[in-house]
């Protein structure tokens, strides 16, 4: 019994890491593996949907309230976005990884940090969370075209695309550093990511709306039927996050050889 329990714990651990394999060919173990894997994946999807819901509800809600009542101010909007992301990272990060962003999920999978087979499920959960949050805001407030809380390019599409790529690059560069590097202090990941989003909204908010997240733009667009420049907020964040992760991994990949060279130099001097 102890051995069986140990095998089950090992299987659960593998499932949580996205490596779902059956350690036994027996029908009982296969059934256990299947049932637990479904539960684990459902937990992750629910966490992503809830996390994305509150990110969009608070962030877009601050935009709507400011446009309707004028009481939040632009700095308040920036801080709200950063705070809600930070809070939700610490709340469900240990369950789902706290992506809340299809571009981040796709990038993690391309760089081997997330299983491909879960990507469509994560994206669906994120979009559902965004759509539900946008629908909630539309029911709570009289959202006129002037009070639209989605993202629409203020200038040209090219300008908004460029700035979305840049700020998404910065966001993923920071995420790669604080959430995937073993040398980083994991406890500060939420703070670092939240502050990065706050800074990005300060810089890019007046130009593109500082989406950095296809789900953040798609949800309000579907609910309010505003599709102007929507492609910018799908293409830009994906390109930016891929580039940010690539550059960070390029820098990190040179770290080990440099340390080995330093050790060799030290041994020669001694």
Curated annotation (Swiss-Prot):
Role, per record: Aquaporins facilitate the transport of water and small neutral solutes across cell membranes.
Locations listed in the record: Membrane
Expression across tissues: Pollen specific.
Family: Belongs to the MIP/aquaporin (TC 1.A.8) family. NIP (TC 1.A.8.12) subfamily.
Domain of life: Eukaryota
Motif (NPA 1): 101-103
UniProt entry keywords in alphabetical sequence: Membrane, Repeat, Transmembrane, Transmembrane helix, Transport
GO molecular function per UniProt: channel activity
Membrane topology summary: Multi-pass membrane protein
Comment on protein domains: Aquaporins contain two tandem repeats each containing three membrane-spanning domains and a pore-forming loop with the signature motif Asn-Pro-Ala (NPA).
Annotated protein name in UniProt: Probable aquaporin NIP-type
NCBIfam families: MIP
Motif position, NPA 2: 213-215
